[in-house]
């Protein structure tokens, strides 16, 4: 039955074997029913239920859990009609789910820990509340704050993807914001997602042709559509009719708009203390206030404008307080280390010492494509080392899915924003020994210069050296001075300059706007038309926003160096090679370590160049350099003065914890250089990427310079074929039983695939091939059956029909180049393979390696060994 427009409510219930039952947390979706819970903004505790409605659903949840007889933790989801108080149970999860992780972070009640103990036969009354250490676990947490969970989508990375939200989950991460009122929590949350938004108001204008349609059909930008509609004068009732979002939430959002309008009527000189305080209480940042009172136009620099408001605010004595999450709504005296920062309070719940013996680690924020659990691993390892060295550890992060936001990982956890303003608030309160910015990916790295200007002690590599590596022009001139090669590039500010540059170096070229993580908005263009079209789409070329164009070298190996240095001298390093050629983003590539096919001379040169770079940049701590090698020519692509996403992988293969070593160096603890023999391994590790194309309807599953994987696996084997086979099976590829469909792109790729095709034939596989590939295989004496492209209508056999009839076990489809025409033809075959769950490989190097692996290694040959046995 369709219940569109009803509310979606969830309860988390815990029951022990003595039949004691409590509800730990109830949550409410901001969006009405019809959108997957993982795609909705979720608020805890529920805000719009009346007392009787709340208790009615609570008693039902307990009844359900008792009836099923669950011992442990259970999650009950309802659809609820506020008009008639009618309800339906949508589902019951008798396991720890995504909602339970949120519930335990939101309440501070350790659900998984309690559920495990209950499973062992303990009663609720026998367990201690591990947050407060003084009360038992047999109580229902009370919250004196509001928590708001917002999903993060990365839909713009995929060609042709469907942006509408529904019952299939497409988000890749989430954030959790804590505030004293709904307005504060939602504004914090919208900033935390990290997509360039500053809250509910004062963002870049969205271009929306049809507002009514955009309100009716939920997409990943719906909240900002509501903001625009309210600015345009839509009433709460009009928006409610279109979106079915509860009027209570809409009235709160309207309140934010009202404060914004009031600010817009002032300038910096007429801004009074009362209005400034009110704006801060309801979640406005100094940045939003500066923009609203028109400082942006005067200063021409938003950071400067924000500092002016910060100074004014401190002059008025408006500073935030630190509150703790103690599961008891402060009704019982308890000390916890789980904290958030707010302006809606009088005094802080915790005291601060001035001994400068604490170290702050900045976390990695929301999981997204390009920055995921790898950086969280780095942050947690750093916290462990800091504690072992006798410092107090402080973590700032806001992602409820991470280990770093567990309250027992560090001495103090600030569950709050990683913006300059908030980090400075916390530094002002804590006066730490130093701050670590190199273990959280790009977000902390971008803050380094701003923090340094405020004289914040940054541990490890100095901020100006970080800037020298991040700023392409400075980094490039340093390479040139030291005689180190790099792909020819130029930062250009007009179309004429771009044309001149391209005429000089020739196609293909790599085009990218400056300062990005995970290759967002990068593209390889192989002719004039593509170049013009891409520049119109992705970047408005101007004086302030130059576009970097560099020569792209085809068929070059990509090699990475992950290392740790002390005072510019390399202490430990790991050189790994990509199986795919350069042109596939390093986060999507399949990586082998130690490298299997590099010339000794190449490795020697890479070590030499890395030593030079480390010395020039005075590196202290972790860094990563990416190289391109063709024959023995070695070019530097980029250098990051922070831990990279391959750090956990190389640390585990080498059994040497790079982050532990780096943290000791940053703290100034003397370390010994690891033994040389450590770096000679007699086994191979392979890191493969996990893709989620089946969830992203209509997206083209092809790999390019823009990162699109959502996870990864690491496997060890006695040789590279065994390790590769394990890792491909781990990411859900299957070994084909009988038939393989080949369509292998340009002449170079066809030649690369020839040996693999012969091998398939020798091992009894039947080959199907499309037009050009079929002709090429036949010329080389390889039997195959010709199949037709979707564009050859009326001819048979059609590739798509064979796929639908389940006659194909694996598809190797390699686009000649990434032009739209070429992509569209192969797109239908690639998309059909994904939708019909047929293994698909779109890279010739990876396809050859995988085919070689499954032809030469049988499943019986694979040993199962523990990590320690290698």
What are these regions (language model features)?
Residues 279-282, 288-295:
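Extended, domain-scale alpha-helical bundle/helix-rich regions
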Residues 470-473, 515-520:
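Conserved A3 ("GATE") glycine/threonine-rich loop of ANL adenylate-forming enzymes
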Residues 1-274, 279-283, 303-305, 316, ...:
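ATP-dependent carboxylate activation and anion-phosphoryl transfer catalytic cores
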Residues 189, 297-304, 311-316, 320-484, ...:
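ATP-binding N-terminal substructure of ATP-dependent carboxylate-amine bond-forming enzymes
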Residues 507-514:
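Conserved anion/nucleotide-ligand pocket segment
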């Amino acid at each position: 039955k369709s219940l569109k427009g009803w509310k979606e409510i969830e309860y988390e219930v815990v029951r022990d074997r003595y039949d004691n039952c409590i509800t730990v947390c109830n949550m409410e979706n901001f969006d009405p029913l019809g959108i997957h819970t993982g795609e909705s903004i979720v608020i805890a505790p529920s805000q719009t239920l009346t007392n009787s409605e709340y208790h009615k659903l609570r008693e039902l949840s307990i009844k359900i859990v008792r009836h099923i007889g669950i011992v442990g933790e259970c999650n009950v989801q309802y659809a609820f009609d506020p008009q008639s108080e009618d309800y339906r149970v949508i589902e019951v999860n008798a396991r720890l789910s995504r909602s339970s992780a949120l519930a335990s972070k939101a309440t501070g009640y350790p659900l998984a820990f309690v559920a495990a103990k209950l499973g062992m036969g303990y009663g609720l009354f026998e367990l201690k509340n591990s947050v407060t250490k003084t009360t038992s676990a047999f109580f229902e947490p009370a919250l004196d704050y509001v928590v708001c969970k917002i999903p993060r989508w990365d839909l713009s990375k995929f060609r042709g993807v469907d942006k509408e939200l529904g019952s299939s989950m497409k988000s890749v991460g989430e954030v959790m914001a804590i505030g004293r009122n709904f307005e504060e929590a939602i504004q914090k949350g919208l900033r935390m997602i990290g997509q360039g938004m500053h809250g509910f108001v004062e963002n870049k204008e969205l271009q929306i042709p049809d507002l009514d349609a955009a309100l009716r059909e939920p997409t990943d930008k719906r909240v900002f559509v509501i903001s625009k509609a309210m600015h345009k004068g839509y009433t709460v009732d009009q928006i409610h009719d279109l979106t079915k979002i509860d009027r209570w939430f809409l009235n709160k959002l309207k309140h934010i708009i009202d404060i914004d309008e009031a600010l817009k009527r002032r300038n910096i000189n007429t801004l009074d203390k009362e209005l400034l305080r009110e704006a801060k209480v309801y979640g406005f940042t100094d940045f939003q206030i500066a923009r609203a009172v028109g400082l942006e136009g005067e200063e021409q620099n938003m950071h400067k404008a924000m500092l002016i408001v910060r100074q004014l605010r401190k002059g008025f004595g408006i500073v935030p307080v630190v509150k703790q999450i103690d599961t008891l709504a402060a009704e019982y005296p308890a000390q916890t280390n789980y904290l958030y920062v707010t302006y809606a309070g009088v005094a802080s719940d915790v005291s601060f010492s001035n001994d400068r013996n604490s170290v702050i680690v900045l976390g990695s924020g929301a999981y997204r494509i390009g920055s995921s659990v790898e950086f969280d691993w780095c942050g947690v390892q750093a916290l462990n080392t800091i504690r072992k060295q006798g410092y107090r550890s402080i973590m700032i992060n806001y992602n409820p899915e991470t280990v770093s936001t567990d309250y027992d990982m560090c001495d103090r956890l600030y569950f709050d924003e990683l913006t300059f303003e908030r980090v400075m608030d916390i530094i002002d309160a804590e006066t730490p020994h130093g701050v670590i910015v190199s273990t959280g990916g790009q977000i902390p790295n971008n803050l380094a210069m701003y923090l340094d200007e405020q004289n914040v002690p940054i541990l490890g590599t100095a901020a100006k050296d970080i800037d020298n590596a991040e700023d392409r022009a400075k980094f490039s001139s340093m390479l040139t001075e030291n005689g180190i090669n790099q792909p020819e590039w130029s930062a250009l500010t007009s179309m004429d300059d771009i044309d001149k540059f391209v005429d000089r170096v020739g196609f293909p070229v790599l085009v990218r706007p400056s300062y990005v993580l995970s290759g967002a908005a990068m593209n390889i263009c192989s002719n004039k038309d593509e170049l013009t079209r891409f520049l119109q789409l992705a970047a408005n070329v101007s004086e302030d926003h130059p576009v970097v164009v560099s020569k792209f070298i085809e068929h070059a190996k990509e090699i990475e160096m992950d290392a740790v240095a002390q005072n510019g001298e390399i202490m430990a390093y790991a050189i790994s090679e990509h199986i795919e050629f350069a042109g596939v983003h390093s986060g999507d590539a399949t990586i082998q370590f130690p490298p299997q096919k590099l010339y000794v001379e190449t490795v020697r040169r890479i070590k030499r160049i890395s030593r030079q770079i480390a010395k020039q940049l005075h590196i202290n701590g972790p860094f990563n350099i990416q190289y391109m090698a063709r024959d023995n020519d070695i070019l530097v692509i980029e250098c990051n003065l922070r831990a990279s996403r391959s750090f956990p992988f190389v640390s585990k293969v080498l059994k040497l914890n790079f982050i532990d070593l780096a943290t000791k160096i940053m703290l100034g603890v003397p370390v010994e250089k690891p033994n040389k023999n450590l770096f000679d391994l007699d086994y191979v590790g392979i890191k493969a990427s996990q893709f989620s194309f089946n969830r992203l309807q209509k997206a083209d599953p092809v790999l390019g310079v823009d990162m699109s994987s959502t996870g990864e696996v690491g496997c060890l084997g006695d040789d590279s074929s065994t390790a590769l086979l394990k890792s491909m099976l781990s990411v859900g590829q299957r070994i084909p039983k009988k038939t393989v469909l080949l369509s292998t792109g340009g002449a170079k790729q066809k030649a690369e695939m020839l040996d693999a095709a012969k091998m398939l034939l020798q091992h009894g596989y039947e080959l199907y091939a499309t037009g050009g590939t079929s002709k090429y295989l036949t010329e080389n004496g390889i039997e195959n059956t010709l199949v037709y492209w979707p564009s050859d209508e009326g001819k048979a056999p059609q590739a798509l029909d064979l796929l639908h009839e389940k006659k194909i076990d694996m598809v190797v489809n390699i686009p000649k180049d990434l032009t739209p025409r070429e992509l569209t033809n192969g797109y239908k075959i690639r998309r059909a393979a994904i939708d019909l769950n047929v293994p698909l490989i779109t890279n010739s190097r990876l396809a050859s390696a995988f085919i070689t692996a499954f032809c030469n290694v049988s499943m019986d040959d694979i040993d199962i060994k523990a990590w320690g046995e290698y």
